[in-house]
Amino acid sequence: MVYSYTEKKRIRKDFGKRPQVLDIPYLLSIQLDSFQKFIEQDPEGQHGLEAAFRSVFPIQSYSGNSELQYVSYRLGEPVFDVKECQIRGVTFSAPLRVKLRLVIYEREAPEGTVKDIKEQEVYMGEIPLMTENGTFVINGTERVIVSQLHRSPGVFFDSDKGKTHSSGKVLYNARIIPYRGSWLDFEFDPKDNLFVRIDRRRKLPATIILRALNYTTEQILDLFFAKVVYEIRDNKLQMELVPERLRGETASFDIEANGKIYIEKGRRITARHIRQLEKDEIQSIEVPVEYIAGKVVAKDYIDTNTGELICAANMELSLDLLAKLSQSGHKRIETLFTNDLDHGAYISETVRVDPTSDRLSALVEIYRMMRPGEPPTREAAENLFENLFFSEDRYDLSAVGRMKFNRSLLRDEIEGSGILSKDDIIEVMKKLIGIRNGKGEVDDIDHLGNRRIRSVGEMAENQFRVGLVRVERAVKERLSLGDLDTLMPQDMINAKPISAAVKEFFGSSQLSQFMDQNNPLSEITHKRRISALGPGGLTRERAGFEVRDVHPTHYGRVCPIETPEGPNIGLINSLSVYAQTNEYGFLETPYRRVRDGLVTDEINYLSAIEEGNFVIAQANSNLDDDGRFVEDLVTCRSKGESSLFSRDQVDYMDVSTQQVVSVGASLIPFLEHDDANRALMGANMQRQAVPTLRADKPLVGTGMERAVAVDSGVTAVARRGGVIQYVDASRIVIKVNEDEMLAGEAGIDIYNLTKYTRSNQNTCINQMPCVNLGEPIERGDVLADGPSTDLGELALGQNMRVAFMPWNGYNFEDSILVSERVVQEDRFTTIHIQELACVSRDTKLGPEEITADIPNVGEAALSKLDESGIVYIGAEVTGGDILVGKVTPKGETQLTPEEKLLRAIFGEKASDVKDSSLRVPNGVSGTIIDVQVFTRDGVEKDKRALEIEEMQLKQAKKDLTEELQILEAGLFARIHAVLVAGGVEAEKLSKLPRDRWLELGLTDEEKQNQLEQLAEQYDELKSDFEKKLDAKRRKITQGDDLAPGVLKIVKVYLAVKRQIQPGDKMAGRHGNKGVISKINPIEDMPYDENGTPVDIVLNPLGVPSRMNIGQILETHLGMAAKGIGEKINQMLKQHQEVAKLREFIQKAYDLGDDVCQKVDLNTFTDDEVLRLAENLKKGMPIATPVFDGAKESEIKQLLEMGGIPTSGQITLFDGRTGEQFERQVTVGYMYMLKLNHLVDDKMHARSTGSYSLVTQQPLGGKAQFGGQRFGEMEVWALEAYGAAYTLQEMLTVKSDDVNGRTKMYKNIVDGDHRMEPGMPESFNVLLKEIRSLGINIELEGE
């Protein structure tokens, strides 16, 4: 493998045995591609905004005299960039402008004569834009739109599995689900009649819908039944014989023909009998007259003489009727063929319970069911039925729905109309009856072929269409009302409904979620999440076990591991690593094609439906050097089952071993050795890891770390190759390679880094350069690390030296004992940034004022504020300190005599305002790192606001000037080259000022042209600089757009540094979580023979019962990696020759059985080897991919190489006594995470606080400054102890005895420590509750 200069700095040793056939796809593509589809112009009009516009336009007036047509649309430029939107708290969006054409037709003239055409561009609201990382900035906060897994449109056949009816009879049903429009259900009842429901309303006999489609009884029976024909010849009854229909029946009479008895009465008719009848070509047999009684006629029979109806279709025949028919000359009688086995008489029975007889009565019946209580008219009934399933405005199956519908009914074509046809409805009924008759299977609704993904773009398009339809109504009104000659398209369109629909979706839809920004992994997983909840999806309460369960079709599409614990389990899933959606929105996963036992590199993406037809081998099947299967029998999956197949039967093979799992689970090393429940916790807890102060790459990883760090967008990645020209903490400048430059540009790329900003979860986002001046860079190299990344690899935690042993009960029940060294070295210190805002409003009594002049506040409290009343940057503050001084006008209240006196002495001021300053919340302390002031337009800016503005302007000017200088330098270097090539001496040039160079003329015409081009570029650069500076200045100095009634907002950012402490929650990557019980002095920790103490002591009992053995293997491998690092460190300290160093490191990389990673250090220069060694001396990072990891034997080899016992266990000594522990202890390096469940955020104590209104008991919870509930069981405990007085206090004065607690407070102040308990308020509530039930209850006095 070829490594770039940056990648050579640290190479992960990979234990993977299988070569990577397919690179890991870009992990955010599901979001970005979907949104791109939504906003890009689509000439076909299949999806996105274009499709929405085409579906609603043209809008015609009711009279048809005019119409509004759609021409095209364009998205403007956003006003603010992403960062500015976040700071100002606005939405990152672009204005949508649509070109519309108003066409007015002549009234009297023949149809289609145009009188006037007006075209105009109309503003249609703002469309939120997606940032390059797949998020949206809505009102200043980053949000993610989660993809939804919903039931695909189409037709589904299902059964109730015998649960509905007490008899346990299985009732079948069919459901036609459109993309939008009414649902149509067909279902059997326990009596085997077929019913229909529209939109899950009251059920009607299914034949009603056929009558509404204008079918007569005769036609209905004709559609669903085969006929049995009887003929009356010579007063005998002959039946036309179809031998196959007799199979399985018992003969009720002798079946004879041509004088030969084929089957005797009472005998079961078998296949042999049928073969005989067919062989002798028997066409008809004589049947006794009684046999026809009870059969059902297939059509109406009318007396030809009188015209009287003898027998209507679907009537049962009796002997009398037969005689009547015979008399009136009907010698040929058609009846329905039914039997109990596989030709049920369901439709015939249903026609009998159907109250309607013709189309009109059927339509009226449907109207009554849909609109109960409204009087039906013929027109209304017809319109309603027509609009239900046959109108393109109201009903749409969509391309997906039509494809699924036609596939289900086994039709050849997969395209067709979006509305239903008669045939569609009849074929669905036929298939349902077929399933009831035992032909065909019901669908599995949890199969991923029946569930599809709805991503951002599609949901946004649907919302946009909803807005457009609202506008359509208004436009129709306007077109009918107004004077069209003076109206323009702009007057027709009101953009409000559209913006409202879009805003509602992005702001408050259930699937638009506040982004989980704890660390890069949590961001990426949130964007790849797939939810079955949300509008049009399931609800938690109704989702049963089956929907939540892992389905065989999840393989390679949805992760079987990563899902939340709790009520949402299985409803919220994560996309597998290689999965993507196809054009219809179904999930598909890649496979390698296998031909005649040879595995090729051709890759096909298969959806769940397609996959069912193939035999697919696993990724870990053994192949020889040619790529053929080694074994004759290969373990494969086929039709959802796993079994052995011969190698010639195999069609496909998995692409990779980590194809099954999601990104989160693919980061767990030795996942294959963990129990699934613990792996689930491990995958979920990695998302809660807080970025530490200094990120530390995992010694034992899986090789996915780099992909996650780069794709998450938290790192700065080189857009083009080049050389680092400038680097500091906040910007990196690259001189681009000649071959990657565009014609006529300066060839300089500038990357501005994010410094100490707040994330959604209040963690700290900070980027730090990881490249140096002069280094060569290739496209895609990581230039700067973000939070939780280390040299471009994801680094969520720290490598800790752990020992598995008990230690004085401090690791009982998963507690964790931590060494003080971890705190001293700041290994788990994290920075949390809080944003506190102070809003100054315009009140009825006058405006609130931000000022340092606050009544009744001492000098000390104001010491950290400047003269504008805003805290200084850099001030250290603690709970209760004032951050922004603010006073609110106070209404004139009745003054107390004391106040009157004060007022008389000191004058007005003190009393007419009250202090409403912004203070630091209780329990928080930290450093102020930033302050921002937003002032409404037209409100005078205070001194601090002007200072901040001045600073921002300076910074902007400095940034742009530096940018200009860098670009100029690059340009002048090229001008210099052209001049020297054109014959100007370099020495003379150096004496001439740079800006005079462009005045020189060259004799060489080509060079002169080049020089002129460069001169143009120089002028362009300068004018560009001026424009940018001007725009920046305008943005910074303009007033802010604040909410109504708000004059000023001051935002203060407070950084809190949190060290690890007892009560914090920590975890490994294998679901091994625990709480820190004690921080132990270094000298008390167990140490090894070299005197190295361990960092963390874990309980060995946490492993066996939980079956997450991966942690032990990780510990051993981590120890080996550290040992090798130690050896490299020794060699560096002894200044050994580079050749020896190279040989040792090469040996480490080559170790392992048929490992597929090849690192050839002979291609590295000595400097590169030394730099690699420097980065490896703290431990050699190792990758052990999921399901393809290091074997036990390889771990032992590595341990040996690092000079560590192959048992992985060493002798430890007690730090307190120095005595050796009895047994050897497993010691090694485990990657530990600090989770965002910090004790500082949970610790809470209440003094006097707020009380609940009804019960007068203290509120609960930290946010309400609430108390601890002393519940029923706690009361029992006090009763059991007989602690009567304590109990009385708890139930009265400490809770809801209002007078008692006030008096108690007063007593304590007076130094009188007695209490007089009274009546608890909740007792009164109980009395009132009982009285409300109509029972009078009174308390009797003593």
UniProtKB/Swiss-Prot annotation:
A Pfam entry, by short name: RNA_pol_Rpb2_1
Keywords on record: DNA-directed RNA polymerase, Nucleotidyltransferase, Transcription, Transferase
Residue ranges of the TM segments: none
Family classification: Belongs to the RNA polymerase beta chain family.
Assembly notes: The RNAP catalytic core consists of 2 alpha, 1 beta, 1 beta' and 1 omega subunit. When a sigma factor is associated with the core the holoenzyme is formed, which can initiate transcription.
Gene3D superfamilies, per database record: 2.40.50.100, 2.40.50.150, 3.90.1100.10, 6.10.140.1670, DNA-directed RNA polymerase, beta subunit, external 1 domain, DNA-directed RNA polymerase, subunit 2, domain 6, RNA polymerase alpha subunit dimerisation domain, RNA polymerase Rpb2, domain 2
Matches recorded under InterPro entries: DNA-dir_RNA_pol_bsu_ext_1_sf (IPR042107), DNA-dir_RNA_pol_bsu_external_1 (IPR019462), DNA-dir_RNA_pol_su2 (IPR015712), DNA-dir_RNAP_su2_dom (IPR007120), DNA-dir_RNAP_su2_hyb_sf (IPR037033), RNA_pol_bsu_bac (IPR010243), RNA_pol_bsu_CS (IPR007121), RNA_pol_bsu_protrusion (IPR007644)
Organism for this UniProt entry: Serratia proteamaculans (strain 568)
A GO CC annotation given for this chain: DNA-directed RNA polymerase complex
The enzyme's E.C. designation: 2.7.7.6
GO molecular function, one term: DNA-directed RNA polymerase activity
General function of this protein: DNA-dependent RNA polymerase catalyzes the transcription of DNA into RNA using the four ribonucleoside triphosphates as substrates.
Keyword Transcription annotated: yes
GO BP: DNA-templated transcription
EC main group: transferase
Catalytic activity: RNA(n) + a ribonucleoside 5'-triphosphate = RNA(n+1) + diphosphate
Protein name stated in the entry: DNA-directed RNA polymerase subunit beta
